[in-house]
């Protein structure tokens, strides 16, 4: 099995924008809202998601460490667009508190995926365990062709 990380450029099901400067050390040429220097916030905002297809379903797994299930939303738009979003809110600073270091990131993420036609969006299930969100989109049963026997005469 190959674990090649694919670009979304030619993926017809991905609705992510392509950044031609992604991966370069000097940052994004598209004026990203999350500069490379703040890689923790960028990692959270980008929410890495794996999408695999099994014979029965399409399975999405998203790393959302530190988020509660109430802070994550899974929705279907227009009947065939899976939307996964979440937000980690910055901890309230009390006037009496003295902060020595703030390293945990806060921010929002939003990812959309166009689902293939052979899915059942009305039966989507989602669960969270150990900081990993799993979304399962069942597939329709393959349609068996109607076979009609033709009687041979003569």
Swiss-Prot record:
Specify the domain of life of the species encoding this protein: Eukaryota
This entry's Gene Ontology molecular function terms read: unfolded protein binding
Q: Which InterPro entries match?
A: A-crystallin/Hsp20_dom, CS_dom, HSP20-like_chaperone, Small_HSP
Q: Which UniProt keywords apply?
A: Cytoplasm, Stress response
Gene3D superfamilies, per database record: 2.60.40.790
Task: Outline the inducing conditions.
Answer: By heat shock, arsenic, azetidine-2-carboxylate, cadmium, copper, ethanol and hydrogen peroxide.
For this record, an example GO cellular component is: cytoplasm
Pfam entry (one): HSP20
Q: Where is the sHSP domain?
A: 40-154
GO BP annotations listed:
protein complex oligomerization; protein folding; response to arsenic-containing substance; response to cadmium ion; response to copper ion; response to ethanol; response to heat; response to hydrogen peroxide
**How does this chain assemble?**
May form oligomeric structures.
Report the protein name in the record.
17.4 kDa class I heat shock protein
Species of provenance: Oryza sativa subsp. japonica
The protein's gene is named HSP17.4
